[in-house]
């Protein structure tokens, strides 16, 4: 057993998990449960009353956090300590949304001035493009942006841009390309005019296979459509650490934006990786996004653990994963603009906490990162919600909804809200056999048929959920929401004693992919790998089954 599972608190939680009453009983016995188990900060309201928890549960979970030195680990992250131990890096995405007055030390120097300089450079660039001052190679203004990246440099900008669609104000169109499948970029290029298109290439090394391949394809298209090598600088900019490679490509050094080792890809949308966002919503709104995230950072760093929203959410996720064998967690967004958030949180959580050894290399004997999935309400109610209500797996849920709609049409939002709240109630209370029989009492079915149908209509309830509300979806509230989930992810990793900031599984996939690519291009059939890999490579080389 590991130190964590040997602890008295862990053992107490395991015993306590078997003694929790049904949530129906918990609500019946405590009329103040909603007010006692809700929290408001940074423009967000969290109702965590529909969890399998009593005051004793929270006390035990908070004790577990204290024993894991969560407070000290939070301070270490904000202080710029080397908490990504396998890569010997600080973890300072929080510095990207810091204020100019702060001092944050990384690698022996204050990094805040460079962050502020980059924001100012972004401001100048966004103004140049959106004002029409930036011209393409034929003198036309830019109308379309193509953002080329992968992972965090793709998903963050895309999902945030989608979420903030009501704040698009610059008249630009933005297209996102990530997958190395040629169909992805080909379909985008069919829509574009090379004279009015600007490409943003985002890659720390300027060598990420998918991103570089797509960028080279974009460049070849641009040159084939009338552009010249000397025109590349007017249509390509880069966010990268490798200035030399970017300038060799033809990008003007003045149009290269920095990336830093102390920011992981899945935490990078707050940096110049967020250029596509800023080009769509303007820098004032982009700064509001940063402001909301900074407010959540301040809350996370300073609020007592018992009143700390990311801590509460992280502890409950751990509670279900480690003591109720919950293998997945569903995120349900009751707002069309937020429909992409489950995929974003999926990458954030699963790439961060999909680990199986502790910081000192000991194999864990407890579950770590769950599968994160989800979708848009109310669509999911007519699909996978069935499994949430009557399936055999316990799947904790997060419901996210703004109280006010950007598009208040008739009763649409009232119906949306009623469905959201109704689902949380149904998951919590379920339906008993007696209740199901009562519903069938006036039917013409025989008693035997009624009993049979009633058994099929029984729902156990006691299915946990959090509900997150905001007044309205704005850049500021979105920033706070995303930062909330970043810190929630950190809380779990800190207690599990794993490194939430490396991704060696991703790196292995890249390495083996490059090796296979070389074998695909070889003259002879593949023979050196396992039989399956050899067979697949050779079938691909034949081009038919």
Curated annotation (Swiss-Prot):
Compartment list: Cytoplasm
Example of a GO MF term: carbohydrate derivative binding
Record carries keyword Iron-sulfur: no
InterPro entries: G6P_Isomerase (IPR001672), G6P_Isomerase_C (IPR023096), Phosphoglucose_isomerase_CS (IPR018189), SIS_dom_sf (IPR046348), SIS_PGI_1 (IPR035476), SIS_PGI_2 (IPR035482)
Cellular component aspect of the GO annotation: cytosol
PROSITE patterns listed in its UniProt record: P_GLUCOSE_ISOMERASE_1, P_GLUCOSE_ISOMERASE_2, P_GLUCOSE_ISOMERASE_3
Catalytic activity line of the entry: alpha-D-glucose 6-phosphate = beta-D-fructose 6-phosphate
GO biological process, one term: glucose 6-phosphate metabolic process
Residue ranges of coiled coil: none
CDD domains with a match to the protein in the record: SIS_PGI_1, SIS_PGI_2
Enzyme Commission number(s) from the entry: 5.3.1.9
SUPFAM superfamilies assigned: SIS domain
Recorded superkingdom: Bacteria
Keyword Isomerase applies: yes
Residues that span the membrane, as ranges: none
Record keywords: Cytoplasm, Gluconeogenesis, Glycolysis, Isomerase
Recorded metabolic or biological pathway in which this protein acts: Carbohydrate biosynthesis; gluconeogenesis; Carbohydrate degradation; glycolysis; D-glyceraldehyde 3-phosphate and glycerone phosphate from D-glucose: step 2/4
Signal peptide start and end residues: none
Active site residues of this protein: 351, 382, 510
Function: Catalyzes the reversible isomerization of glucose-6-phosphate to fructose-6-phosphate.
Protein family per UniProt: Belongs to the GPI family.
Protein name: Glucose-6-phosphate isomerase
Species in which this protein is naturally found: Shewanella sp. (strain ANA-3)
């Amino acid at each position: 057993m590991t130190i964590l599972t040997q602890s008295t608190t862990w053992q107490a939680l395991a015993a306590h998990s078997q003694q929790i009453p049904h949530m129906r009983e918990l609500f019946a016995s405590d009329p103040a449960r909603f007010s006692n188990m809700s929290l408001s900060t940074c423009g967000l309201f969290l109702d965590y009353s529909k969890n399998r928890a009593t005051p004793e549960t929270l006390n035990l979970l908070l004790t577990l956090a204290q024993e894991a030195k969560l407070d000290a680990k939070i301070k270490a992250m904000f202080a710029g300590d080397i908490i990504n131990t396998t890569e010997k890096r600080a973890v300072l995405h929080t510095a990207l949304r810091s204020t100019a007055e702060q001092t944050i030390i990384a690698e022996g120097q204050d990094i805040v001035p460079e962050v502020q300089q980059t924001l100012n450079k972004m401001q100048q660039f966004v103004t140049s493009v959106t004002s029409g001052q930036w011209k393409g190679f034929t003198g036309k203004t830019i109308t379309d942006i193509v953002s080329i990246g992968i992972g965090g440099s793709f998903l963050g900008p895309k999902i945030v841009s989608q979420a903030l669609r009501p704040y698009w104000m610059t008249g630009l169109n933005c297209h996102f390309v990530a997958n190395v499948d040629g169909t992805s970029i080909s379909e985008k290029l069919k829509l574009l005019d090379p004279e009015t298109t600007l490409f943003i290439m985002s890659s720390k090394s300027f060598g990420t296979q998918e991103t570089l391949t797509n960028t080279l394809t974009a460049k070849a298209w641009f040159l084939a459509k009338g552009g010249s090598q000397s025109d590349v600088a007017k249509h390509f900019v880069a966010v990268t650490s490798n200035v030399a490679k970017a300038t060799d490509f033809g990008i003007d050094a003045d149009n290269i934006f920095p990336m830093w080792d102390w920011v992981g890809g899945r935490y990078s949308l707050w940096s110049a990786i967020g250029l596509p966002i800023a080009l769509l919503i303007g820098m004032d709104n982009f700064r509001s996004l940063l402001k909301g995230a900074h407010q959540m950072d301040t809350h996370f760093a300073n609020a007592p653990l018992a009143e700390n929203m990311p801590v509460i959410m992280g502890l409950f996720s751990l509670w279900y994963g480690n003591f109720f064998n919950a293998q997945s967690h569903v995120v349900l967004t009751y707002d069309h603009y937020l429909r992409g958030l489950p995929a974003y949180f999926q990458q954030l959580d699963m790439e961060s906490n999909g680990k199986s050894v502790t910081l000192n290399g000991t194999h864990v004997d407890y579950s770590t990162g769950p599968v994160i999935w989800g979708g848009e309400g109310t669509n999911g109610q007519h699909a996978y919600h069935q499994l949430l209500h009557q399936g055999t797996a316990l799947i904790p849920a997060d419901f996210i909804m703004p109280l006010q709609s950007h598009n208040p049409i008739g009763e649409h939002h009232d119906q949306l809200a009623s469905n959201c709240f109704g689902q949380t109630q149904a998951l919590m209370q379920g339906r008993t056999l007696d209740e199901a029989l009562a519903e069938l009492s006036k039917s013409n079915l025989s008693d035997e048929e009624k009993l049979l149908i009633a058994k099929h209509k029984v729902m156990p309830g006691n299915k946990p959920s959090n509900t997150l509300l905001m007044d309205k979806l704005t850049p500021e509230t979105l920033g706070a929401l995303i930062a909330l989930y970043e810190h929630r992810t950190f809380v779990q990793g800190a207690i599990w004693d794993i490194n939430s900031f490396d991704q060696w599984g991703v790196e292995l996939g890249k390495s083996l992919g490059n090796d296979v690519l070389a074998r695909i291009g070889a003259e002879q059939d593949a023979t050196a790998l396992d039989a399956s890999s050899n067979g697949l490579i050779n079938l691909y080389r034949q081009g038919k089954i």
